[in-house]
Design a protein with these regions (language model features):
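Terminal targeting/low-complexity segments that flank the catalytic cores of oxidoreductases
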Residues: 1, 257, 263-281
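Conserved alpha-helical "signature site"
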Residues: 1-248, 280
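Short, surface-exposed acidic
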Residues: 200-204, 254-265
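ATPase catalytic-site recognition across NTP-hydrolyzing enzymes
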Residues: 251
Length: 281
C-alpha cells in the first residue's frame, strides 16, 4: 500500500532512532557467510564483546544444558553448543537488547520474544527440509516481527489500538495496523533491517510476509509457515492471534497443509524450552 509523505517521514525518523545492531553481531554474520570461517574466528569476535560473552556463558551453564562442569569461556561453549547454535544465540542476545524494557502499548516484550525465537527455530527446521540455508531462515524468523517494536516505542497509542482490534478478533494485526496507522509492521521491519544492513533477501522476506503482499519464495514459505505454527501451538505471542492456513504455493513447497506440517515436525516442546532459556538471557 502507498504511504503518505508525512507517514513515510515519520516512520523513517522512528527507524532512525532505533539503536544500531551491535557491531560484534554484524561481524559474526559476516564471518559465517565466509566458507573459510572457523569456530576460532567466531570465538575471537565474541570474546571482544563482554555483554554477549557473559550472556552466552549464562545460557550454556543453565539447567537446560545440564553440563557436567561449569563452562568459563566462549571457546569451551562452542564445543558444547556447536558453531551455528552459538551464532544464533549471539543474534538472539542482540535482538533482546533492542526490546523495550517496559510493557509499552500493552505489548508484552517477553511473549513477543518467545514467539520470535520459536518462529526462528521452526523456520530453520523447515529450511533444512527444502534445501535452503537454515541459518538465514533463523535470522528471518527472529526478525520477522521487529517492526512491531518500532510501533510500540514510537507510536504506542496507535499500536495499542491495533493490538486491541486483533485481540478481539476484529482483524488480523497487519490489517489493523494498516487501518489505524496507514502501514504495517512488515514495511517498517523491512526498513529497519535495511538500516542494519542485512541481506536484501531478508528485507524482502519481512516486507512480503502477509496477505496480498505475500510472494512465493522459499524463505518466505518457511517464515510464513513457522509464524503460523508458533501461533497455533501458542509458543509466545506477537500480538496477533489470527492463524492463517498455508496458501497453495507454500503448502506445495512444504508438502502439506498447516496441520500436516505441524504433525510432521513431531514434538517441539524441547525447542520451546530452549527458546525460554534464550529469552531469559
Amino acid at each position: 500500500m502507498t504511504m503518505s509523505p508525512e507517514l513515510s517521514q515519520k516512520l523513517a525518523a522512528a527507524v532512525d532512532r532505533m539503536p544500531a545492531f551491535p557491531r560484534s553481531v554484524q561481524q559474526i554474520l559476516q564471518l559465517t557467510r565466509d566458507v573459510n570461517c572457523s569456530p576460532k574466528d567466531l570465538v575471537r569476535v565474541i570474546d571482544h564483546d563482554p555483554v554477549v560473552t557473559v550472556k552466552i556463558l549464562r545460557v550454556v551453564n543453565s539447567a537446560y544444558y545440564s553440563l557436567p562442569k561449569q563452562i568459563t569461556s566462549v571457546n569451551h561453549a562452542v564445543v558444547y553448543m556447536g558453531f551455528n547454535s552459538l551464532k544464533n544465540l549471539a543474534l538472539s542476545i542482540a535482538a533482546i537488547g533492542m526490546l523495550p524494557k517496559d510493557n509499552v502499548a500493552g505489548f508484552d516484550a517477553h511473549e513477543y520474544l518467545l514467539h520470535s525465537l520459536t518462529t526462528a527455530n521452526i523456520a530453520k527446521l523447515l529450511a533444512g527440509r527444502i534445501g535452503i540455508d537454515p541459518n538465514d531462515c533463523f535470522i528471518a524468523g527472529l526478525l520477522h516481527d521487529f517492526g512491531k517494536v518500532v510501533f510500540a516505542q514510537f507510536m504506542p497509542k496507535e499500536f495499542r489500538e491495533a493490538l486491541a482490534m486483533a485481540e478481539w478478533g476484529q482483524s488480523s494485526l497487519h490489517l489493523a495496523l494498516r487501518a489505524v496507522i496507514g502501514t504495517d509492521h512488515a514495511v517498517v521491519g523491512a526498513m529497519l533491517v535495511e538500516k542494519w544492513r542485512f541481506a536484501a533477501e531478508l528485507a524482502e522476506t519481512i516486507r512480503h510476509q502477509h496477505g496480498e503482499d505475500l510472494i512465493d519464495t522459499p524463505m518466505i514459505a518457511c517464515v510464513f509457515a513457522a509464524n503460523q505454527i508458533s501461533k497455533k501451538l501458542k509458543f509466545g505471542s506477537g500480538g496477533n492471534p489470527c492463524i492463517d492456513e498455508l496458501p497453495p504455493a507454500i503448502a506445495q513447497r512444504l508438502g502439506g497443509t498447516l496441520d500436516e506440517v505441524i504433525a510432521s515436525l513431531g514434538d517441539l516442546d524441547a525447542m520451546f524450552e530452549e527458546a525460554k532459556i534464550f529469552a531469559s538471557s
